[in-house]
Amino acid sequence: MNSKVIHWQDFDLSAFGIAKNLQEKHNCDLFTIIDIPNRPKKFFQEQSFVKYQKKWFYHDHISPNKKPDIEYLKYIEKNYKIDIWKIAYNDRIFFKYNDFYKFTSDEVLSIIEQSCKLFENVLDEINPDFLLMPVTNSGRMHIFYEMCKAKG
């Protein structure tokens, strides 16, 4: 049976090159969460360099203006040992000095909740053996890393 590798793809294409090389040299099934804006999305939808078993486009799973489920977020903090507000305060998008948009507390929690639900669904569906990602550079990426680590 092939190893299952979940790959986090963002704007840094070096991870994409590593995934391609990994697939060429090892028997593994690659899955990916693609965290990019809509403009470059078409490339990842149509590319044939890396054959992913399944891919999730992160932004397709995030909707604005949803009321956060506080009980679910407490469950995430407890089961995965994640301090949600600590991560949110350090996120470059939610950061209080972001001049482009000021997120409300509900917006922040809603986005984090939707992210966690996506990540839980992905991890439950594929049960990966390995995680391939660069150093975390966003709150959502760090939450995914922590959830993978907690699941073992």
PLM feature spans:
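Conserved N-terminal ligand/cofactor-binding loop architecture of enzyme catalytic domains
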Residues: 21-114
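Active-site and donor-binding regions of nucleotide-sugar-utilizing enzymes
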Residues: 8-21, 80-152
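Extreme N-terminal starter segment of soluble prokaryotic enzymes
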Residues: 1-5
